[in-house]
From Swiss-Prot:
This is Actin-5, muscle-specific. PANTHER family: ACTIN. Its EC number is 3.6.4.-. Oxidation of Met-45 to form methionine sulfoxide promotes actin filament depolymerization. Methionine sulfoxide is produced stereospecifically, but it is not known whether the (S)-S-oxide or the (R)-S-oxide is produced. Muscle. It is an enzyme of class 3 (hydrolase).
Amino acid sequence: MCDDEASALVVDNGSGMCKAGFAGDDAPRAVFPSIVGRPRHQGVMVGMGQKDSYVGDEAQSKRGILTLKYPIEHGIITNWDDMEKVWHHTFYNELRVAPEEHPVLLTEAPLNPKANREKMTQIMFETFNSPAMYVAIQAVLSLYASGRTTGIVLDSGDGVSHTVPIYEGYALPHAILRLDLAGRDLTDYLMKILTERGYSFTTTAEREIVRDIKEKLCYVALDFEQEMATAAASTSLEKSYELPDGQVITIGNERFRTPEALFQPSFLGMESCGIHETVYQSIMKCDVDIRKDLYANNVLSGGTTMYPGIADRMQKEITALAPSTIKIKIIAPPERKYSVWIGGSILASLSTFQQMWISKQEYDESGPGIVHRKCF
């Protein structure tokens, strides 16, 4: 769709990253951290044009002098003023569009509180004057992006993980499970175990370095105990990483110990089940007749499912839990980091979807509650 005139905007607001672009495109045009930064100190030099807040990459690059805040925690918007800044930045600075000229599709976490959807709707129509909007559940969009309408999605991002069983395009709310264990926790855990090695990472700025180490070097072991033995016996699993100041650090078993916490949350001092067991429990909460379809369509989605080895390990773990006769398939699309956005892009450009938008007129007549009647 080269005609960006009235094409819909698709904005996937994650706890860690905001993905935004135009419906019909195959990838988001803008991907930036969901952060708002405010100066720690008043500017010393008058007239330096220091802003009172920075969003996204600019906040990231000036992180040394700022206090960084994430307006989305565990997938759910908790700070609306900052969130408005993120949306403003998305429309005006990243996409460079006038929001009053384009319908906008927003995404939400599964089990998002009703009041939250209403507030999102209100801000779009009242602050940004959107002509039309829609709110879609993230995991459902990931499933659409994989070309399915039935399956179970494990969506794991920076702030939260969910297992969402979906049948014929509808999420089954009674069987959705939430796990407050995701990318940010793994970054914190890696910071902690690197400290045990004698490297010190403490500030928010250093946390970003550790996040980069995690994304570049970590992987999921097929057999954790065996991998630990290999790591202890030789240096074959060690990798080095150069810090911004030129210092080189070595990382060994931390490479697979970090994401192992997804399967063994006790590593983080959490009592919850691992992601494999959460998927299994989610399936077991569904009607017995659809379980077979769910086992055969396990879709991974989100940045925290990007570790090499995660699909094989999931296959192994779920096979061990499920009945022996059942066929289990894990689908891990290479673009799964952005599959929520891609699903939104597909949905918003379908001709059949055009009647689903909530228009400004409907909003003016019914108020924010309209979102519960039109988006499900």
